[in-house]
Amino acid sequence: MKQYVIVFLTLLLSAPLLGQTPDFVFSNTNGKIPVQAYKGYHYVKFPFQSKVTAYVTLKGEDTESVEVFPKGKVSEVNQIQNTVSIALYEPGVYMLRLNKKHKFFIFADEPYSLPTDKPIINIVDLGIDNTGRENMTSQIQKALENASGSGAVLYFPKGDYKTFPLTIGRNTHLFLDEDATIMADTSDIKRYYPTDDLGTKRFIYIKDAENVKIHGAGSINGNGKVLRTRYGDEARMRLMMIFRSKNVDIEGLMFKDPGSWNTQILCSEDVSFNAVKLMNDIELSNTDGFDPDASKRVLIENCFAYCSDDNVAIKITKTSGYMQNVEDITVRGCLFLTKKSSLKVGTETRGLLMKNILFEDNDVIESDRGMALYVSDGATLENIRYINNRFEYNYPDAKRCGINFVVRKRNKDSKLGMIKDVLIKDCFFENSFPKMSEIKSEAKGLINVHIENLYIENQKVSSLSEGQIEVKNSNIEIK
């Protein structure tokens, strides 16, 4: 018989004052778990052991509406006055939306533990400060280099590790404990200037590496808001850059506060992200989530991203001249919120072919555009599948449409590309988006889309008008 863990979450809201932050309390049978506040929303993390019943109480404000996401994973939601109870039967990411404005995220992760079959190197035992007061760049970099190829796990216990950019090499295994944070030093932007031919600033750099594993319940914090405020556009940097690497596995971590795109995967193969949480500053421009760029066999699964820009943008940027085709990208089982596009390919499509891309079983809670395909630089998009994705609310930004597929020339010298063999199947828009969806091309015969079992507000779409889809020079089949 499964052990039942009772979890109590109390949301304490006094009559709100200007600028006042709500107070939250979260506890279970093992005691209180600290609640984190970040940019107008709150979250809590804990290891999921068995069924969890959560109790949510909103004080100082009547609980007039309650929504819990993903809807398909939460079946037992009850309310007594201002208290809401929720039964969680499996690990994952859950979101509460109270009175259509208060967001609370629960990260109930699979428990992470140090491997027992490998030697462990505790980085603190190497004399490295974990108070966050001292910069430890050279010491941590040396530890990374020594761990590379050693067969040992480099272990970061609880604490704050302040550093400038770090490079992770081949055959490296890192484990970040819960409450362990690798944090970007904000004192000198020049230390982030690239020193190789890849002219992109980055904090954590995995370059020319194979067999890299980084996992655990810890965090990597780019301090992007502070850096951008202090240094402006100079501080637009990737929190993580994976470049020309193979067999990279990232699991369980939280990537927080990038200065620009959170994670770029450039010219790499066999890269996976599982249960990774991207927490971007939603008021900071250009903070994409996951950006697979000229890469092959990338898996993004059971992840979370809250972004000011695209949640996922699969592209070929030709960064510093590096370019190859895109193949076999899968985004599955994730929960996303964004002010821009959520499930996107493009806009940069500077290669020849981008094929075999699957978006499956994702929950998009907020987006300006749910599904987006943009070809502006002449590439061909082939075999793009949107299967069993759910879209809840429109975020009021530039386009405000559920589907936006466009083939155009970026400039007069650009070539026209193609979007072919696109399948939208078993996808649901809980609410209609305010503007018409668009599927448009500058010339005929360049876009082919098959739509099957598309629902808007519980009504099956059987025509372009019912789907609120405006079409130009495109072949669309609906059934």
Which stretches of residues belong to each language-model region?
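Positively charged n-region of N-terminal signal peptides that target proteins for export
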Residues: M1-Y4
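Sec-dependent N-terminal signal peptides
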Residues: I6-L9
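Extracellular/periplasmic carbohydrate-active domains that bind, remodel
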Residues: L11-L12, L18-K479
